[in-house]
Regions:
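Active-site PLP attachment segment
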Residues: 218-256
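Conserved glycine-rich beta-strand-loop-beta hairpin in the small C-terminal domain of fold type I
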Residues: 278, 294-303, 315-327
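PLP-dependent aminotransferase-like
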Residues: 105-166
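Helix C-cap/helix->beta junction micro-motif
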Residues: 131, 191-192, 222, 346
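PLP-dependent enzyme catalytic core of the Aspartate aminotransferase-like
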Residues: 222, 332, 341-350, 356-386
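Structural signature of PLP-dependent enzymes
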Residues: 255-261, 280-303
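N-terminal small-domain helix-loop-helix segment of the aminotransferase-like
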Residues: 2-95, 102, 281-282
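Active-site phosphate-binding strand-loop segment of PLP-dependent enzymes
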Residues: 141-210
Length: 386
């Protein structure tokens, strides 16, 4: 079956954060929204059909996640990432941001140092600061070939840290970390008893010619010193289902984490989240394959257009995610002026780079998970200003 990713869907009036909050966020309601990391493609038919079938039941009472739910995730990860997991390592969380917050609250103490690698997904900062932990920033290094990790600084920071939260693949810069990069990071963390929380929500959005390496798959030592977060929400556009999974091979760590989840009553979930996830994991291979090809074409088109028509914008070829990270520093304008021009002159709603850390000043994150015609229109509007 061939899936249609060119179809335009009007999401206005659906309580969509991405569309219906444009006026609140940007001060202008008619910008093309390319900010929030969800996709504008139709929900896959096999997911929609599974939800509709469940909706036909007469009672929407409390449910649990049966073995088949977790087994579908085990098999997906095995097929796509060659990592042999076990359902006994898995636990439900109501979204990965929740999973990170639960890990911070349940596995660290107030004042503990937690390392992140900016520019990075901004809820990492909130999870640390909001719970009175100490934020330690290990900024990535921007090179001509792309962003790399600062291991020398990490060696020093790890000596007094309790946890490191890694974005693997990295949001927003689009790196799919190589095995050797993760090995070096993992060895530093193991040697200093720093627990690794690996947010792998974008693992199924790695582009052709690149490969995702699950952090915990590298060695038993890394598996025993890590929590991996996985979800179908980015890949199959199910963010509204608030459903994700943590994978914890260490029995003692698993028990401590799951006991804390129980103590917060955050483990009930919802009926349709588990139905949608299981349908995606069991039936989504072909849809996923076509999605990756379409996203890759969108990204290639955008990168080529920018290099040709707006060469002052610096942009690396992403290896994963459906976002591109745009650097406007050569325009020598302020962050505020960049945002004003993008919204009120170009008519585009992108994520301001500064939310990902000070390293993102005068940068922007652009979401390309939309029909090609929208990408083309947006880039032409950007060209008229930049």
């Amino acid at each position: 079956m061939t899936y249609d990713f060119d179809k335009i869907i009007d999401r206005t009036g659906t309580e969509s954060v991405k569309y219906d909050l444009r006026k609140d966020v940007f001060g202008k309601a008619d910008v093309i929204p390319m900010w929030v990391a969800d996709m504008d493609f139709p929900t896959a038919d096999f997911i929609r059909d599974a939800i509709i079938e469940k909706a036909k039941t007469d009672v929407y009472g409390y449910t649990f996640r049966e073995d088949g739910y977790f087994e579908s995730i085990v098999q997906w990860i095995k097929r796509h990432h060659q990592w042999e997991t076990k359902k006994e390592w898995m636990a439900f969380t109501p979204g990965i941001v929740n999973a990170i917050n639960l890990a911070v609250m349940g596995l660290t103490n107030e004042g503990d140092k937690i390392i992140v690698q900016p520019p990075v997904y901004h809820p990492f900062f909130y999870a640390i600061n909001n719970h009175n932990r100490t934020l330690v920033q290990n900024p990535l290094i921007d090179t001509d070939e792309g962003y790399i990790m600062n291991y020398d600084l990490l060696e020093e920071q790890a000596k007094t840290a309790k946890m490191l939260i890694i974005s693997n693949p990295h949001n927003p810069v689009g790196r799919s970390w190589r095995k050797e990069e993760l090995i070096r990071l993992g060895e530093i963390c193991v040697n200093n008893n720093v627990l690794v929380f690996s947010d792998e929500i974008h693992c199924d959005l790695v582009l052709p010619a690149f490969k995702h390496t699950p952090f915990a798959s590298i060695s038993e030592e890394f598996a025993q010193n890590s929590i991996t977060a996985h979800a179908a929400s980015k890949t199959f556009n199910l963010a509204g289902m608030a459903t994700s999974t943590v994978i914890i091979p260490n029995n003692n760590l698993y028990k401590k984490y799951v006991d804390f989840i129980h103590s917060t009553e955050a483990d009930l979930g919802n009926i349709f989240g588990k139905i949608a996830t299981k349908a995606a994991m069991e039936n989504g291979d072909e849809w996923h394959s076509q999605l990756i090809d379409y996203l890759n074409d969108n990204i290639r088109f955008a990168i080529d257009f920018i290099h040709k028509e707006m060469p002052k914008i610096r942009v690396h070829n992403p290896e994963a995610t459906y976002m591109i990270w745009l650097n406007f520093k050569d325009y020598e304008i302020s962050d505020d002026e960049l945002n004003r021009k993008m919204v009120f002159e170009a008519g585009l709603g992108l994520n301001s780079g500064h939310i990902f850390g000070k390293e993102g000043e005068c940068c922007m994150r652009m979401n390309l998970a939309c029909p090609r015609s929208v990408v083309m229109k947006a880039l032409k509007q950007m060209k008229n200003v930049f």
